[in-house]
C-alpha cells in the first residue's frame, strides 16, 4: 500500500492540505480454528496488507470521510446517535464513539483511506480499518493514554455495537499487537499472549482463495457452538470444574461418550485436538521446525473437513492439490464453507504449485482462484 497514493487523494479531496498518516494490517491465523469460543488458543499474525489513512483535525465536530477505493464520501457529527448508512463509515463512526466512551475527546477530522486487504478473503479488512482509526484517535486526541489492549477492544465493541457482528477479539488483537517476524499465541480465556518467531527462510506463506462462500456458514457455525456446549455439559456430570472444551482431555471425552451424540463427539474431538496442535506448533517454531508446522496444518484441515465438517469441495480440492505438489503445510483458514487455504510452500515449489492450483481449479470449478502472498508484519502504527 502506497502512502503517496493515499496522500494525493487526500490533498485532492481536502483543499490541498495534508495530515498525519496511519496504517493497520489485516491478519492470518496460522492454526487454531474454532478454538476461540471454546476457551482455547489462536495463533494469528499481522500481514503486509492492510489499511492506510490520512487524517487531519478540522476544528469542527464533524468527521468528513472519503473511501478512496469505493469513491464514496460521508459526513457525520460526533454527537449524532444514528450511525451512517454506508457500512464502511459505520466502522469509523463506531470507533469514534467507543473512544469517546473511554474518555478520549475526539474532535472532527478530515480523512481519506484505502486498503489492499482483499475483501471477503478472511484477512479481516474491517479489523484493519477499526485499528487504524482507534490508533489514530488515541494519538491525535488522546495523548496515547489508551493502552493497546483497550484499542483492540474498541474495534471489537465497534463490531458488536454498530455493525451487528458478534465477533471475538482475535482480529483486532492481531491488527494492534502485530510484530514483524512473529506470530501471537493468544489465550482466549485469560487473554494472555506470547510472541513466537515466524521467519521461515526458504518458505513462502501464500493464501489461495476459492472465491466461494457457501450460505450455510452462519447457521452451521451456531450448530457447531451448540455441539461444543453439549459435549461440555456431558463431561461436567463427572468433572464439574470443566468450563470449556479447553479443560477437557480425550480421556474425559471418551468417559462421557454414552451421554454425547456421535456428531457432538466428533466436534469436541476436533476442538480438543486443535487446541493441542496450537501448542505443538509453538514448540516447533521455537526449534525452527517448519516441517512439523506443516504437518500440523494438514492435520487441522483433515479435522475441519472430517470431524468438524466445515470445509467444502473447493477447499478440500485445494488442500489435496497442495499435498500432491509437495507443499509443506496447507489448511482451510477461517470459519470454513469457503474462503482461503493458507499454505506454507518451499520457495522452489512455489511457481509449480501456484500454476497447478490455478489450472486444475479452473478445470474443475470453471473459475480461477485468487492468490495472495503474505509476510508477517507490524501492527497499527503512525507512518508520517
Segments (PLM) and residue ranges:
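Short, amphipathic alpha-helical segments that act as regulatory/interfacial helices
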Residues: 47, 96, 134, 229-232
Amino acid at each position: 500500500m502506497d502512502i503517496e497514493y493515499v496522500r494525493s487523494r487526500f490533498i485532492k479531496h481536502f483543499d490541498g492540505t495534508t495530515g498525519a498518516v496511519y496504517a493497520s494490517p489485516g491478519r492470518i491465523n496460522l492454526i487454531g480454528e474454532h478454538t476461540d469460543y471454546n476457551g482455547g488458543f489462536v495463533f494469528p499474525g499481522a500481514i503486509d496488507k492492510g489499511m492506510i489513512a490520512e487524517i487531519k483535525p478540522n476544528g469542527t465536530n464533524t468527521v468528513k470521510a472519503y473511501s478512496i477505493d469505493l469513491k464514496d464520501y460521508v459526513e457525520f457529527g460526533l454527537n449524532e446517535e444514528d450511525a451512517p448508512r454506508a457500512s464502511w463509515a459505520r466502522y469509523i463512526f463506531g470507533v469514534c464513539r467507543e473512544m469517546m466512551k473511554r474518555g478520549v475527546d475526539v474532535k472532527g477530522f478530515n480523512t481519506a483511506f484505502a486498503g489492499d486487504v482483499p475483501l471477503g478473503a478472511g484477512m479481516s479488512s474491517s479489523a484493519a480499518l477499526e485499528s487504524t482509526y482507534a490508533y489514530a484517535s488515541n494519538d491525535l486526541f488522546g495523548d496515547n493514554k489508551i493502552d493497546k489492549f483497550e484499542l483492540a477492544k474498541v474495534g471489537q465493541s465497534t463490531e458488536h455495537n454498530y455493525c451487528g457482528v458478534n465477533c471475538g477479539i482475535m482480529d483486532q488483537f492481531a491488527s494492534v499487537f502485530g510484530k514483524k517476524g512473529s506470530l501471537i499465541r493468544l489465550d482466549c480465556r485469560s487473554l494472555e499472549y506470547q510472541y513466537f518467531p515466524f521467519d521461515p527462510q526458504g518458505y513462502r506463506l501464500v493464501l489461495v482463495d476459492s472465491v466461494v462462500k457457501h450460505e450455510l456458514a452462519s447457521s452451521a457455525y451456531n450448530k457447531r457452538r451448540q455441539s461444543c456446549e453439549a459435549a461440555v455439559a456431558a463431561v461436567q456430570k463427572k468433572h464439574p470444574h470443566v468450563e470449556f472444551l479447553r479443560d477437557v482431555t480425550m480421556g474425559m471425552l471418551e468417559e462421557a461418550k454414552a451421554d454425547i451424540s456421535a456428531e457432538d463427539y466428533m466436534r469436541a474431538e476436533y476442538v480438543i485436538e486443535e487446541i493441542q496442535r496450537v501448542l505443538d506448533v509453538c514448540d516447533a517454531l521455537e526449534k525452527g521446525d517448519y516441517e512439523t508446522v506443516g504437518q500440523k496444518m494438514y492435520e487441522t484441515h483433515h479435522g475441519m473437513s472430517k470431524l468438524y465438517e466445515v470445509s467444502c469441495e473447493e477447499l478440500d480440492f485445494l488442500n489435496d492439490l497442495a499435498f500432491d505438489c509437495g507443499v509443506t503445510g496447507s489448511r482451510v483458514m477461517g470459519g470454513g464453507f469457503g474462503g482461503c487455504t493458507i499454505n506454507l510452500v518451499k520457495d522452489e515449489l512455489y511457481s509449480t504449485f501456484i500454476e497447478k492450483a490455478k489450472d486444475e481449479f479452473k478445470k474443475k470449478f470453471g473459475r480461477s482462484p485468487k492468490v495472495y502472498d503474505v509476510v508477517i508484519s507490524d501492527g497499527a502504527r503512525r507512518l508520517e
